[in-house]
């Protein structure tokens, strides 16, 4: 969501 994983859809 907020910068934990930029590769998640």
Curated annotation (Swiss-Prot):
Q: Please, which domain of life does this record's source organism belong to?
A: Eukaryota
Tissues of expression: Nacreous layer of shell.
In its UniProt entry, what is this protein called?
A: Uncharacterized protein SMPP3
Q: Which organism is it from?
A: Nautilus macromphalus (Bellybutton nautilus)
């Amino acid at each position: 969501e907020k910068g934990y994983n930029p590769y998640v859809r």
